[in-house]
A protein has these predicted regions:
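Structured beta->alpha junctions
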Residues: 44, 51-52, 80, 106, ...
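Conserved beta-strand hairpin/beta-sheet module of binuclear metal-dependent hydrolase folds
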Residues: 3-65, 155-158, 162
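Short catalytic-loop micro-motif centered on adjacent basic/acidic residues
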Residues: 46-49, 73-77, 142
């Protein structure tokens, strides 16, 4: 597998899937798709999004390589659609001290997808539009983008490296 160095602190751990021929079971993708996921290594470590279930194993290999023995402090969930969030519960089980960051609608959908017990309430960090999360030298600011695709979509702006 391959971890992609974005910067000294930001690594791409996503997976290219060249075996899929239809995106969302309807749109032809002759060269496949990319499931994007990132790790930010700082005083606190954050994982941005997971990947589709069909890419779990190579993604976990990339993640293990990128973390290099560290445990993640946060999983930031930008979007709950399965190609972005299929591994949320699995990752939460692998790292029981990791907190999960999302907005209120994110957790509503998460409970519907994985069950209300998948992510304990005390592990949830509910953010509002415009709020920030400091990782140390890097800060994530959350910007809501409802209905860009789904109602709970948000994006993260990393203020240090832009």
């Amino acid at each position: 597998m391959s971890v992609k160095k974005i910067s000294e602190a930001i690594l791409g751990v996503g997976v290219d899937d060249t075996t899929i021929d239809l995106f969302e079971s309807q749109y032809p993708v002759p060269t496949g798709v990319s499931y994007n996921s990132y790790v930010i290594l700082d005083e606190k470590t954050a994982i941005l999004d997971t990947v589709d279930a069909r890419a779990t194993e190579p993604w976990l290999e990339n993640l293990t390589e990128a973390l290099a023995g560290r445990k993640p402090d946060y999983l930031v969930v930008s979007h709950m659609e399965p190609d972005h969030g299929a591994n949320i519960a699995k990752l939460a089980a692998l790292y029981p001290e990791m907190q999960v960051v999302g907005n209120a609608k994110t957790f509503l959908y998460m409970d519907q997808f994985f069950g209300a017990d998948a992510i304990a309430k005390e592990r949830r960090v509910v953010v509002k539009d415009g709020e920030s999360l400091s990782l140390g030298a890097h800060t994530l600011t959350f910007v809501f983008a409802p209905m860009v695709h789904w109602p709970e979509v948000m994006v993260e702006y990393e203020e240090t490296e832009k």
